[in-house]
Amino acid sequence: MRKIGIIGGTFDPPHYGHLLIANEVYHALNLEEVWFLPNQIPPHKQGRNITSVESRLQMLELATEAEEHFSICLEELSRKGPSYTYDTMLQLTKKYPDVQFHFIIGGDMVEYLPKWYNIEALLDLVTFVGVARPGYTLHTPYPITTVEIPEFAVSSSLLRERYKEKKTCKYLLPEKVQVYIERNGLYES
């Protein structure tokens, strides 16, 4: 059976923290690949101003293009409305019955697991992989595999704020993503 990691997110913008997590889990669990799963409208972020799907996808392509073992999965972008992990993973497990999926989440999402839509059924479809994130614990009543990663305290919200305040984001996200953001005037206001 193939082992594939999935890291879902808004990726608004994608940064070195996302890439570090994906790479560390890839090696720790001996995965075949890691798929980045950009979402349409995450249920926990409804109502927030999110950068266009086209821009987020372009930035994600730029961020992941150098890694052979990273791919982008468009499953959630093909649906309108809120993206529920259960619905996505149900589709993916039917589409790829020979794959064991490892769904990678940060400590913030580990704490949020009890509120996930259809969590009990989702546990039958994936193995959750929790990675530590500053300020969060990996304690949950649900079974998760934990992977220790070097601490890298960067988030998409921090980067959006830094761009808004006209602060440098060098060394926090790939240079090609930085150039795209600056050329397209993203996160300026």
From Swiss-Prot:
The keyword 4Fe-4S does not apply. GO terms for biological process: NAD biosynthetic process. The keyword Iron-sulfur does not apply. It holds the Pfam family CTP_transf_like. Signal peptide: none annotated. GO terms for molecular function: ATP binding; nicotinate-nucleotide adenylyltransferase activity. Gene3D superfamilies: HUPs (3.40.50.620). Pathway: Cofactor biosynthesis; NAD(+) biosynthesis; deamido-NAD(+) from nicotinate D-ribonucleotide: step 1/1. It catalyses: nicotinate beta-D-ribonucleotide + ATP + H(+) = deamido-NAD(+) + diphosphate. Its EC number is 2.7.7.18. Keywords: ATP-binding, NAD, Nucleotide-binding, Nucleotidyltransferase, Pyridine nucleotide biosynthesis, Transferase. Catalyzes the reversible adenylation of nicotinate mononucleotide (NaMN) to nicotinic acid adenine dinucleotide (NaAD). Belongs to the NadD family. PANTHER family: NICOTINATE-NUCLEOTIDE ADENYLYLTRANSFERASE-RELATED, PHOSPHOPANTETHEINE ADENYLYLTRANSFERASE. This is Probable nicotinate-nucleotide adenylyltransferase. The gene is nadD.
